[in-house]
Design a protein with these regions (language model features):
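N-terminal Rossmann-like NAD(P)+-binding subdomain of aldehyde/semialdehyde dehydrogenases
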Residues: 1-119
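Conserved small-residue-rich beta-alpha loop and adjacent elements
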Residues: 103-169
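Short, solvent-exposed amphipathic alpha-helical segments in soluble enzyme
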Residues: 138-140, 168-170, 196, 219-222, ...
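N-terminal small/polar loop signature for handling phosphorylated ligands or for N-terminal nucleophile
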Residues: 164-175, 192
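Conserved NAD(P)+-binding/catalytic subdomain of aldehyde/semialdehyde dehydrogenases
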Residues: 175-263
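A glycine- and small/hydrophobic-rich beta-loop-beta segment
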Residues: 258, 265-291
């Protein structure tokens, strides 16, 4: 941890700087991949999976047998945690459902608003250093509550051609019936244009690296809607001496794990808390399977 004490005003602008996405140099490469996926479909996706994810695939869609095997491999504690998180997410988003109210503006003239779900949505869950099953839940639960009729999910496989069991389990309990082994630009292209295996959707949701961000921006120009360009993860925790250092450290690490460009910041007036959180970060890091 880098500890900065009582920074002068002249330092504030520097401290507030965040990692910026430099996408111009990637655009040509991204557009080339998108065009091949558009014209060659599954063949291009499978080829790029071999090139970028170092895996040879015969098919892209996860089978029912793979879903069943994944459920057996996820331990009981993780299943319970996933279900608890799913319930919390569902409770939160259910409260946001649009309630229409009819208003008679003139005798015989009734006006109202109506919220209609997007019929087909594509969810993208990146690979990286950890299985982001929380991202699956955050994307799939709102789509289910909104009433989307077709929800598909793309995520990169490992070099054995498998999706992490926790990803598949989270997808299944959240209501996603179709998952595809595709990552990066090729996954975005497949959902934007459609292939013989992966259906075309009307809107793409989910975070990704710089290449995924550029791909989403490109397909949004004329082909399909997107949620937003996602930047590097960041969190700022404002805490005083009453804060639990274990919780603060966990909050910081939960965002820092997303990548080397993530920003995790603690703002506090307590020297004691700084020392306790720093020690707790070191302790939790020592117990994590990846650093």
């Amino acid at each position: 941890m880098n500890i900065i004490r009582y920074p002068e005003r002249l330092e504030w602008n520097f401290l507030l700087k965040r990692s910026a996405l430099q996408t111009e140099s990637l655009r040509e490469t991204v557009c080339e991949i998108l065009e091949k996926v558009r014209t060659q479909g599954d063949r291009a996706v499978i080829g790029y999976e071999e090139q970028f994810d170092k895996v040879k695939l015969n098919s892209l869609e996860v089978t029912e047998k793979e879903f069943e095997e994944a459920e057996k491999e996820v331990d009981i504690k993780l299943k319970a945690a996933i279900m608890l998180a799913l319930n919390n997410i569902q409770t939160f988003h259910s409260s946001q459902k649009f309630a229409s109210k009819k208003i008679e503006t003139l005798p015989g003239v009734t006006c109202w608003q109506k919220a209609v779900a997007i019929e087909k949505v594509g969810l993208y869950v990146p690979g990286g250093t950890a299985p982001l099953f929380s991202t699956v839940l955050m994307l799939a639960a709102p789509a289910q509550i909104a009433g989307c009729k077709e929800i598909i999910l793309c995520t990169p496989p490992n070099r054995e051609g498998k999706i992490h069991p926790a990803i598949l389990y989270a997808a299944r309990v959240a209501g996603v019936k179709r998952v595809f082994k595709a990552g990066g630009v090729q996954a975005i292209g497949a959902m934007a244009y459609g292939t013989s295996s992966i259906p075309k959707v009307y809107k793409i949701f989910g975070p990704g690296n710089q290449y995924v961000t550029v791909a989403k921006q490109q397909v949004a120009l004329r082909d399909v809607a997107i949620d937003m360009p996602a930047g590097p993860s960041e969190v700022a925790v404002l805490a005083d001496e009453t804060a639990n250092p274990t919780f603060v450290a966990s909050d910081l690490l939960s965002q820092a794990e997303h990548g080397a460009d993530s920003q995790a910041i603690l703002i506090t007036t307590s020297e004691t808390l700084i020392d306790k959180v720093a020690a707790e970060v070191d302790r939790q890091l020592s117990e994590l399977p990846r650093k």
